[in-house]
Amino acid sequence: MGEKKPEPLDFVKDFQEYLTQQTHHVNMISGSVSGDKEAETLQGAGTEGDQNGLDHPSVEVSLDENSGMLVDGFERTFDGKLKCRYCNYASKGTARLIEHIRIHTGEKPHRCHLCPFASAYERHLEAHMRSHTGEKPYKCELCSFRCSDRSNLSHHRRRKHKMVPIKGTRSSLSSKKMWGVLQKKTSNLGYSRRALINLSPPSMVVHKPDYLNDFTHEIPNIQTEAYESMTKSSQTSGLPRDPQDLMVDNPLNQLSTLAGQLSSLPPENQNERGCSPDVVTCQDEKPFMMQQPATPAVVSSVSASIAQSSSPTSPDPRPAHNQRNYSPVAGPSSDRSAHTSTPSISNSQPSTPAPTLPVQDPQLLHHCQHCDMYFADNILYTIHMGCHGFENPFQCNICGCKCKNKYDFACHFARGQHSQH
């Protein structure tokens, strides 16, 4: 026994030195450093062979392999880890096990010298000190959010960006690199960052959980799938569309298109009038409708008039109407907007074959000749034309205010002061 005794004493001495260093580190932070107490502790650790300075009762060491016990009462598991004496927790390192035991004993040696905060873990104290210094080293790569704790950053990603950490094999690229690749593809396709949300026809709204739950796996394929779906939609519609037109195609514009389709279904009496020999004359004699069924003869005349749109034209004579809630009948450019419709609306008429429209700028389809303004949406064009008066195009159809020119007319609606005269 005389030969085995120095081994546990050396181990106990090393363990006491470790505890002393941890206590000294805490005292350095709190500003209460005492060199005399440290010297006494070190001296007492070298001279005494009992365990007066430790919380654990057992000092004896058994070198028998079948005993399963280590110095200071720590039990080893079958895989060699140190097991907690209070629960089933096991750890390979002694320092980690000591931190875990402090949960059971309630010891909190790491204290803040600026406030009453205390913790059993040194990393918790470091994170707490950032609240005093204002340091925020953790930054979200998707927005400008910064925080002082990593757990707050993870909570921000789940709550704000609907990002769930993926367990298992990680992808070869990090999330920051994935975002860079996505933005590069977006810039090459000519879209802005807004296109990440409005890129899924026909609903045009992609909910974030659909593509951000598996952020690092799914995002590189979003742009390609969306681009293929846009290509298919442009091929099936019969009219080539620009990417910017798809950006404008939000759910509000889709509702406007649906309203245009419903308004394009005329009553039976209008069908009888539309089937008269002089179709163009009949439509010129009644107020502007949101959408009218167009015949191939009308479409051919419209395509011929579009080629001559650069030359100034005089407006057609307007019929005399005393009602204000109707839009005026515009000139040739207005006829183009009245007779030319989107392919989905023109195909909804079973009696007339779908004409193939020539490739042209969609903005030229809705033109106000009075204000010299172009509208890509027929609903907005109809609302705008309803603001013009019949007898005087620069007379407000809401309050009856007479304006001098198109600039005065635009300023009147910009101010929004419609007082009834």
From Swiss-Prot:
Keyword Glycoprotein among UniProt keywords: no
Cited InterPro entries: Ikaros_C2H2-ZF, Znf_C2H2_sf, Znf_C2H2_type
Subcellular localization: Nucleus
Gene3D superfamilies, per the entry: Classic Zinc Finger
Cellular component GO terms, alphabetical: nucleus; protein-containing complex
Sequence ranges of Polar residues compositional bias: 229-238, 339-351
Biased composition (Low complexity): 292-313
SMART domains tied to this protein: ZnF_C2H2
Name of this protein: Zinc finger protein Pegasus
Taxonomic lineage: Eukaryota, Metazoa, Chordata, Craniata, Vertebrata
